[in-house]
Regions:
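A nucleotide- and high-energy phosphate-metabolite-utilizing enzyme signature
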Residues: 1-189
Length: 189
């Protein structure tokens, strides 16, 4: 009961953001069920839309200040990257009380199905996720990899060449960036 009371009355927005991905995996089934109920009730709570928008924007700004991109291809931390995508998803989940899936790709698809995200959002997020994995293998410094590695990355991602990869990445970041840039007014409506 103390956890439920804390979540209802005292928890900060960032704590509720973390709950959007929570999934009890250990313990007695009764206890896991009770925890799942508390999480679901917490996530479904009505929220002050202006406060949510303010908190989300401040958190992302603080993160950008304290953890800047490490290179030209840091698709996780660059504007329009995976962190922006995650903030968009979680902000919409908390504001509208729906699409709660611990897996971000499934959450994005659910938000698309409800009309809260555009069709291109999930493919953009998926491309950046696949690129992030590939770059960690061939360019861990998040800089442009050597030409032989560029060809490997392009092929693995289903593109003819590196230029196509970069064009698709720019388009994906544009989609995510547009959603992030428009998040505050959408949360307040």
């Amino acid at each position: 009961e103390s956890f439920a009371k804390y979540q209802r009355e005292e928890a900060w927005t960032w704590e509720h953001l973390a709950l959007t991905r929570a999934r009890p995996v250990y313990g007695a089934s009764l206890a896991r069920g009770q925890l799942e109920t508390i999480i679901a009730e917490t996530l479904a709570m009505p929220r002050d839309a202006a406060k949510l928008a303010e908190d989300i924007i401040k958190m992302r700004g603080d993160m950008a200040t304290h953890k800047p991109p490490t290179g030209a291809l840091d698709v996780k931390l660059l504007p329009g990257g995976l962190v922006d995508a995650e903030f968009v998803i979680h902000a919409l989940q908390l504001r509208f009380g729906q699409a709660f899936h611990p897996q971000l790709d499934r959450a994005a698809e659910a938000l698309i199905a409800t009309g809260l995200l555009p069709e291109g959002f999930a493919p953009a997020q998926a491309l950046l996720t696949r690129l992030l994995v590939m770059l960690r293998l061939v360019a861990p410094d998040c800089e442009v990899p050597p030409e032989p590695a560029q060809a490997v990355v392009a092929k693995a991602l289903g593109f003819a060449d590196w230029a196509e990869v970069m064009q698709a990445v720019d388009a994906a970041r544009g989609i995510i960036s547009a959603e992030w840039q428009g998040i505050a007014p959408r949360l307040k409506n």
